[in-house]
């Protein structure tokens, strides 16, 4: 990760124009992973060419999957090995900074019998919690070992026969749910996942499209049941733009005076659109146009205009999983609302790439923001007058981009250290910012 570069952003600039954000990160990971266990070819278009999905591709190649060199903005085809076709790798599988890669592979590899695998990551990933995946997989018969009683990477997996069972997840996490469902493909009988709240459902949608026997039951899709025995068949996948990347421009257009931005072809999966509900609460001026559905995923273009006198908002409870990655940029937005905004029930942010609650509070205070950090969230008093500052992404991609948007509201020029962290999810972010600055 190239995080050492410093970027300078001049404040008091408006943003105008049309932008197409990179492909959805969640769907990019899953297209590779599910394509790799399908039979036949899977054609992928719109793939996010960034560090995290490329880590997934690299790991799958070491497991024997045919994945060509992936080039930016070019479609490609992978040849799957079937549900139980991975070979034992000769090397350690390095997941880089990608929690999705590590957690989903843990589920996928747990049932690959009589083969051994070791997963590791960078310094940040090796401190992130893996027990939430290793514990349910162990209940299914998985043999998973690691630091701190299997809760921290490096992780060692000895493939074993798994048995289907009913598992309640302690947090509403798409990564945990996906790991269990992928393990369920190789388990005897039926595997059922019960969530405390609805989380991203890209895995369920894609598994169904590939031919898995999967059913969603219960209120808000909280009970997902998968039955082993069905072979998966390769598909054609067109990946929409990532709403978590689009959120930076949607919020920027809302809070930067005289701004208007059209973001094209954004994924509008209802488990990801919490940001739109908060924008409604704030009184933002946006509309969704050019709506369609591709491979079971709704998409549309979002047009957003600046509004003065935005209202404060409260984020808590079941909406958190629908906007967990948007909390950093929403923290910036709250600084420019008229009143006190509150983010609660967001403890999960403390175990992301960084402790995002602490880092966002620390960095935005350098601009002059009025933020109080709580154990599970933030209280932000709006109507801030930002001044230029020396800030630092602290190696977190979403922090880097949030600070860039905050800098547009500051008087003078702001320097952002380790700005290149944005490459993890949005490699063209700084180029796109230059295009939009008016």
UniProtKB/Swiss-Prot annotation:
Pfam families: EPSP_synthase (PF00275). GO terms for cellular component: cytoplasm. It is an enzyme of class 2 (transferase). GO terms for biological process: amino acid biosynthetic process; aromatic amino acid family biosynthetic process; chorismate biosynthetic process. The active site is at 325 (proton acceptor). Transmembrane segments: none annotated. It catalyses: 3-phosphoshikimate + phosphoenolpyruvate = 5-O-(1-carboxyvinyl)-3-phosphoshikimate + phosphate. This is 3-phosphoshikimate 1-carboxyvinyltransferase.
